[in-house]
């Protein structure tokens, strides 16, 4: 979910409590709030880049397009190596977009902070990946 501007952890937690939800805060630091509610992990993150979010879901939720999400994940690989990002990128690159298309969009959003050469290298380098969130893919052979 995307919101323009800074996140406000107290307001977020108040909204959960108003809805009588039990919440476990796992991280609360400048620009980021991680919590667990109903066994679902949420990350609220102050993302300093202006990303379009034109896809509307249920008249009140707006998210980026799949290509924009792929560009964000490509950029994120340079800062963190999360298994879930590799999995998401696997399916996006396999079924929807090329590395060049993702890179073009990432360069549009992140400019010289993004490197297609680095991204291609990261797709082939698995040392240091965080497997904290393992996906159970029973539909894969």
Give the location of each predicted region.
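Compositionally biased terminal segments of proteins
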Residues: 1-141
